[in-house]
């Protein structure tokens, strides 16, 4: 499931695979079925409540602007121009150099962007647990998805820091397994 759009175009999309997995479902509160759909929708509505799509767009635009300005500033330095073999921004050969600097800037910014995304996902997980008070379903859902997707339960730490937009399966299970009083960390 995911949230998309802004204002009147805002939507929560639930995949047919989640609905199919819900099926007629086990007993309420047993960790699956319709309870899982409710938990997932609560998670997505937490993203709506906190305007995560809007903040994601603003963050990406700000990061892009900073990256472009940094690339231009770096490109104006003589040593960078000499290293790339160009005479300045007006040089047609400058385009590949600017693209290279942009890619390097994206790699430098990736850990921060990924950490913010993981934080927003963890916050939405907390909200869904606060709303549903159903950690059994949260754990069962994480296990089901991990098995279906053959998730790496111990992902490479560097790859996690650089590129992971969501907490690991094990982190989400650990979060859902905390005692109920701990479920007040995010609002």
Residue ranges of predicted features:
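Hydrophobic alpha-helical transmembrane segments
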Residues: 87-101
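Hydrophobic alpha-helical transmembrane segments of polytopic membrane proteins
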Residues: 99-111
């Amino acid at each position: 499931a995911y949230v998309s759009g802004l204002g009147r175009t805002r939507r929560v999309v639930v995949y047919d695979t989640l609905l199919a997995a819900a099926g007629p479902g086990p007993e309420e509160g047993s960790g699956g079925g319709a309870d899982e759909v409710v938990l997932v929708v609560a998670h997505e509505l937490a993203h709506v409540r906190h305007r995560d799509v809007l903040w994601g767009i603003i963050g990406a635009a700000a990061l892009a602007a900073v990256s472009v300005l940094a690339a231009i500033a770096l490109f104006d330095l003589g040593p960078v121009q000499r290293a790339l073999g160009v005479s300045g921004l007006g040089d047609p050969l400058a385009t590949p150099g600017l693209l290279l600097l942009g890619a390097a800037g994206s790699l430098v910014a990736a850990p921060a962007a990924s950490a913010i995304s993981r934080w927003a996902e963890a916050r939405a997980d907390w909200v869904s647990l606060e709303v549903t008070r159903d950690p059994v379903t949260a754990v069962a859902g994480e296990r089901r998805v991990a098995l279906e997707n053959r998730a790496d339960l111990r992902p490479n730490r560097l790859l996690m820091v650089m590129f992971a937009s969501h907490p690991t399966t094990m982190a989400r299970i650990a979060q859902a397994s905390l005692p109920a009083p701990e479920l007040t960390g995010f609002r």
